[in-house]
């Protein structure tokens, strides 16, 4: 699992916290940040440089002219897919926790309202 990350020398992909991707000239710069250890001010990170792939494509759709375009490297695309799996998993866990807490707060308010309603009904019965 995570063969592309391991080929970059990342032996513990589960310690990845986040990543950033930017373009500089004809290169894409990938920076991977790892979870901070206690007492560290900055997260450990590693940087990788990927040359952009150049392609010549039809410019006007009729075949009259051509233009050169640059695309992200296929290898980088595979690495980003793996990074997205890792980073999305963490976000999904946080979102699930937030949903459970929201459901719990909603349940508390529903129960509190029902208790007030039942107490009001009891109060009506005791007045008669």
Curated annotation (Swiss-Prot):
InterPro entries named in the record: UPF0325
Protein's UniProt name: UPF0325 protein CKO_03204
Family membership: Belongs to the UPF0325 family.
Domain of life: Bacteria
């Amino acid at each position: 699992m995570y063969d592309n990350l391991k080929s970059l020398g990342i032996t513990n992909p589960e310690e990845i916290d986040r990543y950033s991707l930017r373009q500089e000239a004809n290169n894409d710069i990938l920076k991977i940040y790892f979870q901070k250890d206690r007492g560290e001010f900055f997260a450990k990170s590693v940087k990788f440089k990927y040359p952009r792939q150049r392609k010549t494509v039809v410019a006007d759709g009729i075949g009259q002219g051509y233009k050169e375009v640059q695309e992200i490297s296929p290898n980088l695309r595979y690495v980003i897919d793996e990074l997205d799996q890792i980073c999305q998993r963490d976000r999904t866990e946080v979102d699930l926790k937030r949903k459970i807490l929201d459901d719990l707060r909603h349940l508390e308010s529903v129960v509190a309202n029902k208790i007030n309603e039942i107490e009001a009904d009891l109060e009506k019965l005791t007045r008669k």
